[in-house]
Amino acid sequence: MLACHHNCKHFGICGGCSSPQTEYELSLKAKELALHNLFSPLIPSQKILPVIPCSPILRGRNKMEFSFYQTVDGEKTLGFISPSKPKKGIPITECLMIDERAIDILNYTRSWWATHPELSAYYPPLNKGSLCTLTVRIGNVSNDFMIILTTSGREEFAVPLSVIQEWQKTLLDSGLPITSIFWEEKLSARNSPTTFRTTHLYGEQFLKQQLSIEGRSNIFHVRPRSFFQPQSRQAEKIIQTIKDFISPTGEETLLDLYCGAGTIGISLSPYVKKIIGVELVPDAVASAQENIQLNSANMEVFLEDAKQFCRRHEHLPPLDIVVIDPPRCGMQNKALKYLLRMSPKKIIYVSCNPLTQISECSILVEHGYQLQRMQPIDQFPHTHHLENVVLLERLSF
C-alpha cells in the first residue's frame, strides 16, 4: 500500500480530508468497524468481506470541483469552502487527492479572475454573484483534462463571452494537456429545478475513460455533466464485485437503474443476455448511448426517472437481476415500492452513503429479501466516506 509521509498543508481546515494522509490504514479500519456496526442487524459479520483499499491512495481522483468565494469585505478566494462556522474560503495551493496540474489550472484561473474585479463570487442562498465553480476532470486514457467553468445565468450577473474567452486563452496558453473546455451557466430560480446552459468552447465534446474487467477493456466517453466514478481503478473493483456477486450464466436480463454513462451495464454486458439501463440526466443518457455503440454492448438505455420506469414495468415477469447505484439520497420510497413490485430475483445495491443504504435495505428485507454478501470499497481515502456493494436475494417467488 502506498505510504504518505506528510499531510497536505490544508489538512484540518479545507473540509476535504477528515483523517491525516499519514494514517490511511487506521482510517480504513475505522470505516470498516463503523460499517460492521451499522449493518449488524441485517447481516452476519462473516458475510461482510474485508474492505478493499483505495489504490492509489494519493492523486487518484479523476474529478474535483473548486468553489469561488468572497467575504462581505470583498476578499476573494478560489478553492474549497471550509465546513467551519462562519464559513471561510480556502485558497487551495496543494491537494494530494488529484493530479498536481489541477492546481496549475486553479492558479491560472485565479490570475484571470484578478484581472476582472467586477466579477463577484456566486452566493447560493441569495442566487447572486457571477462565478460559481471550476471543475477539473481527468481522463485515464491520455491523462488529459476537461475544464468546466460554471457561472450564474442571471442576466444581471452574466459574464460576457469575451471575458470567458480570455479565461479560455489563459488556459490554452499554459501548455497543459487540456482536451476540452466548457462554460456552463447556472439557471436557478425559486421553486424551479436548477438547470444548466452549456457552451462548448474548445476541443473534444467528451473525455475518455477506460475500465478493464477480467482482461476486457471498454472506453467510455464522459461529458461535462455525466456521472463517472471518481476513482477509475476503484470503479473497476466495484464492477468486478458486482460480476462476482451475481454469478451470471449468460442468460440473464439485467436492469441497471441510475446507469449514468453506462459504465456498469456496458462492462457487464459480455456476461449476460441483455442490459436495460435507466437514467434521468439527458447528458448522461447521450453518453451512455454513445458508449453502447462505441463498445458494441448489448444494452438499451431509457431516458426516464427510475420510479416511473419501475411503475410502468411492475407487472412484467420478475427480472433476473437489478443493479441500483442511486444518488446519496437513495432510491426514495416510491421508487423502492415499485421495484419491490417488480420482484427481481437478485438486487445489487451500490451506495456511497451506507446510512441511506441500510435504511432501504431494511425495507427490502421486510419485503422478502435477504442480504447475502457485502463488499465495502474505499473510493475516498482520508475521508469518512465508503462505497458499499450489497447482494440481496429474494427468498421466495
Swiss-Prot record:
Family: Belongs to the class I-like SAM-binding methyltransferase superfamily. RNA M5U methyltransferase family.
Protein name: Uncharacterized RNA methyltransferase TC_0118
Keywords: 4Fe-4S, Iron, Iron-sulfur, Metal-binding, Methyltransferase, S-adenosyl-L-methionine, Transferase
Pfam families: tRNA_U5-meth_tr
Class of the enzyme per the UniProt entry, highest EC level: transferase
Active site feature: 352 (nucleophile)
GO biological process: rRNA base methylation
CDD domains: AdoMet_MTases
Gene Ontology MF terms in the entry: 4 iron, 4 sulfur cluster binding; metal ion binding; rRNA (uridine-C5-)-methyltransferase activity
Gene3D superfamilies in UniProt: 2.40.50.1070, Vaccinia Virus protein VP39
Residue numbers binding [4Fe-4S] cluster: 8, 14, 17, 95
PROSITE patterns found in the cross-reference section: SAM_MT_RNA_M5U, TRMA_1, TRMA_2
PANTHER family found in the cross-reference section: RNA M5U METHYLTRANSFERASE, TRNA (URACIL(54)-C(5))-METHYLTRANSFERASE
Signal peptide positions (record): none
EC number: 2.1.1.-
Taxonomic source organism: Chlamydia muridarum (strain MoPn / Nigg)
Entry keyword annotation includes 4Fe-4S: yes
Keyword Iron-sulfur: yes
Positions annotated to bind S-adenosyl-L-methionine: 229, 258, 279, 325
Segments traversing the membrane: none
